[in-house]
C-alpha cells in the first residue's frame, strides 16, 4: 500500500475528518476516511501525537470501573477513567487530573505507564497511553463536567468477572477487567 495523498475534508471543533488516498496492491486508488484529534498537514504527521490516557486504577484489591453514558452509542457502558491530554500537560498530570475530575479520587502512586498505542486504528490515528495506578480517597462526582454522566465504583475480581459476562464494556476496559479478574495485576 502506498499513501498518495492526505486531504482534510472537515474541520470540527474537536475532530478533523481526512481522506487518505492509497494505491492498493492491484495498483488502483482507494479512498480511506479517518478522523483525527490533531491537525495533519502531511502524511508523516499521521499517528505521531499522543492524545490521551486510559487509567486502570486499583484500591484495596479492587478495580475502578466507570459506568458512563457515551453519546456516540446513546447508552451506558463500563469503561476506564480516561481523558484527553491538555496542551502542555504531561501524561502524569493528565492521569491525576482525570482521576480527580471523573471520580473525585486522588492518585496515590503510578504503577506503570505503557508506551503509546493506537486506540481506534480502523478510524483514527489517535494514540493513547494506558496507566496502571493506585488511587485513594472517596468517590465523588462534584468535580465532573456537566457533559459527563458517570457512576464510578470499585469492584472485586469476582464482581468484575460477573460484570464482564453480563454488561457492555469498552474493548480496552474489558481486556483490563478480565486481566484483573484473573489476577494478572494488582496494587
PLM regions: where:
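Short amphipathic beta-strand and strand-loop transition segments with alternating hydrophobic
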Residues: 1-11
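Acidic, metal-coordinating catalytic segment for phosphate/diphosphate chemistry
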Residues: 10-54
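Nudix hydrolase/Nudix homology domain
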Residues: 6, 72-77, 83, 87, ...
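Active-site segment of metal-dependent pyrophosphate-handling enzymes
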Residues: 58-60, 69-71, 77-79, 100, ...
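Short, charged, solvent-exposed linker or helix-capping segments at domain edges/interfaces
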Residues: 28-33, 140-145, 164
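Conserved Nudix-box catalytic region and its N-terminal flanking loop in Nudix hydrolases
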Residues: 49-97
Amino acid at each position: 500500500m502506498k499513501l498518495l495523498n492526505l486531504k482534510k475534508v472537515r474541520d470540527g471543533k474537536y475532530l478533523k475528518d481526512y481522506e487518505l488516498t492509497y494505491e492498493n496492491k492491484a495498483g488502483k486508488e482507494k479512498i480511506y476516511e479517518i478522523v483525527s484529534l490533531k491537525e495533519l498537514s502531511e502524511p508523516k504527521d499521521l499517528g505521531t501525537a499522543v492524545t490521551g490516557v486510559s487509567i486502570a486504577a486499583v484500591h484495596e484489591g479492587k478495580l475502578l470501573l466507570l459506568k458512563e453514558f457515551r453519546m456516540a452509542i446513546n447508552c451506558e457502558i463500563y469503561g476506564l477513567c480516561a481523558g484527553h491530554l491538555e496542551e502542555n500537560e504531561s501524561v502524569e498530570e493528565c492521569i491525576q487530573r482525570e482521576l480527580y475530575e471523573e471520580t473525585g479520587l486522588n492518585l496515590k502512586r503510578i504503577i506503570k505507564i505503557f508506551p503509546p498505542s493506537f486506540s481506534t486504528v480502523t478510524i483514527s490515528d489517535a494514540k493513547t497511553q494506558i496507566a496502571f495506578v493506585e488511587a485513594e480517597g472517596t468517590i465523588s462526582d462534584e468535580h465532573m463536567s456537566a457533559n459527563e454522566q458517570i457512576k464510578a465504583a470499585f469492584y472485586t475480581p469476582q464482581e468484575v468477572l460477573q460484570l464482564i459476562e453480563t454488561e457492555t464494556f469498552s474493548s480496552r476496559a474489558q481486556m483490563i477487567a478480565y486481566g484483573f479478574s484473573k489476577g494478572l495485576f494488582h496494587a
